[in-house]
Amino acid sequence: MSGKLNNKVALILGAAGKDNMGQVMARRFAQEGAKIVVAGRNEDSLKEISSEVGGDYAVCDITKKEYIDAMTSKAVDLHGKLDIGIQATGWGYLSPFLESTEEDLVKIMNLQFKGPYQFFQSCIPAMKEGGNIIQISSATATIMLDNHAAYMGTKAGIDHVIRTIANEFGEKGIRANSISPGLTATPMTSDAMAAPGLEDAFKKEYPLGRIGTSEDVAAAAVFLCSDECFLSGQNLQVNGGLTLRRNPRSHEIDASVAAAVAKLEGN
């Protein structure tokens, strides 16, 4: 059966977590006919998902440029080209503004700004016949979430880099877009979402009445990378309308729910 991404080579960074958003995208892209290279830090998990989707893998620490370049080179060596680069790593750093440490600020800048920036720098020269860059961002790049200033700032910053890429490389047939989920049901968030009242506190702010899933994000990514898409430089808000409203404020939810929110990792 013909798929929307037949024979496109997709490199998905951030696909080492069991059933995380990157792995869900890898499965969906493979179903659409793409050739998959998954990347991340957990080699055992990468082996498992790459075997499942009939693809390959590369171990990569996004904070180290030599790992990023080696990963991209491996994808090109395996398939002779690169059509799609997806950046799905992140760290949901939570801290009151005045309490953010220099060490943590350097860490989140490396994970959510410098690393993705260098990933895009590595992918673009390999896209000889055009291609697609996708950044998994966050609704919090647009609307507030208490005690997440550094997280929100780095997400918003890399969104602007995406627009810059779209502007500078459009004439080479390269499109660049970002996707902004809100709170998303994943294995990583399952423990926190089990806290009494947490899901309801968030869900009431979603006009569509439910929390998002990784499958929602994967479907949007397939569209953005398909030949039928004419979007570039856009931030796709895949969050059920959350950005029409707001995230719950910390004082509006009880202590047990607030503690669970504090454990959530970002997209």
Model-assigned labels for residue ranges:
Residues 170, 175, 231-233:
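Short, small/polar-rich loop/turn modules that mediate ligand/substrate recognition or access, typified
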Residues 96-97, 101-107, 198, 202:
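Substrate-binding pocket helix/loop in short-chain dehydrogenase/reductase
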Residues 120, 154, 162:
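Active-site helix of classical SDR
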Residues 232-267:
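Short C-terminal tail/terminal secondary-structure segment
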Residues 3-36:
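Canonical Rossmann dinucleotide-binding motif of NAD(H)/NADP(H)-dependent dehydrogenases/reductases
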Residues 125, 167-171:
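Alpha-helical segment proximal to the catalytic Tyr-Lys
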Residues 126, 210-238, 243:
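C-terminal substrate-recognition "lid" of short-chain dehydrogenase/reductases
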